[in-house]
Amino acid sequence: MSFFQNIITSVMKGTRRLNRFRSKGFGKLHNNINKAVDSVMSTSGEVSSLVFAEHLLNLIEDLDDNGLKKFLKDLLKNYSSNKNTENFEKIRISSEPGWIELFRRLNSSSNGTYRLVKLRERIRSLNDEDLKTFDLRLLKLFKYWFNPSFLVLEKIDWETPANILEKIIEYEAVHEINSWDDLRARLAPVDRQCFAFFHPLIPNDPLIFVEVALTTGIPKSIQKIINLDRQEIEIEDANTAIFYSISNCHNGLLGISFGNFLIKQVANNLKRELPDLNQFTTFSPLPGFMKWMEEYSPISFERCIEKNCDDEELIKNAVKYLTKSERKDGMPNDPVGRFHVGNGASLERINLNADMSAKGLSQSYGIMANYMYDLAVVEQNLSLIHI
């Protein structure tokens, strides 16, 4: 049994134990949500705390959006800093809102970590400034709970359990996976690989994954990477690893940068396995390019809309978009570029007609970019950014 399978088995055993404890009863389980909060916060027993927390999470998840807003605002009013100190001095630092401890206790319930991630996702979707503090405080907690040292890197292949493969199809954010044949083409061949980070408490749901093409040199279009009828190569012949799709899986974890650690760990692992690999690069979309042209180069934008934009004009605008910045922090205009440059990569090449899909044409008129991860200098590049 693999290490990862052991994690899943341990988590499932813990869930079954909690279900057995729940059936024994630990006092009244209040259907009044505010009383249910009091039960979670006032109990001192480890097992009873888990049972009360599980019950409260069920109540929270059953609330509609208006009910959730009311519950959270009541929580702010009743459990804010410097209030109820007497009741909670044993379970929290006095300078911290009491409801932070509530979330810590909810995290201990069955599948609590995942459910709190989904709760933050809901809170963000409400777009209520009064609830911003919950978004920020949960993010702070998640940065501890999802520390990279806790994460497990797993290779995803065609033999991976179907429930996880379904998640890969669902979460793919860059190049849509339209069928199981499409997925198989990205996972089964020896020159195509996929890696994901998992959290031990969310073992059946990836946090982020990257798809990798092993090639000879850098192709000029994404279609040469993802087409079903492409020519496969022997893995020993590859000299280049191309990270062509990176997908974050949970909106409730926005603000936590897993990608930096994922790419570098995968690159180093591949280099150990395949010493002949000498290039590690991305094949990246330019999701903001057309919007940028509409504002900063409107004549070129109109020509593109009319399909009358020449290559030289496109390249000139793309270079400006990717290398100049209208941002106060001086980082690249393009969000994908910011991510990779922020990780220590450097812009290597701009490719015309690289993504001729409807999505590729609408967001960047088919242009894509390569960002090079030079493992020898990537950390040095990163340090220069933060000087």
Identify the residue ranges that each predicted region occupies.
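N-terminal low-complexity, Ser/Thr- and acidic-residue-enriched intrinsically disordered segments
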Residues: M1-E172
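A structural signal for short, well-ordered beta-strand segments and their strand-loop junctions
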Residues: A196, E211, Q279-P285, R349
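Conserved small/polar residues in nucleotide/adenosyl-binding loops
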Residues: I385-I387
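Acyl-donor binding region in acyl/amide transferases
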Residues: L228-A345
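A general structural signal for short secondary-structure junctions and capping/turn motifs
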Residues: D157, R184-P189, F197-N204, E232-E234, ...
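C-terminal/domain-terminus segments
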Residues: G337, L347-Y373
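Extended, Lys/Arg-enriched charged tracts that mediate electrostatic binding to polyanionic substrates
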Residues: Y144-Q223
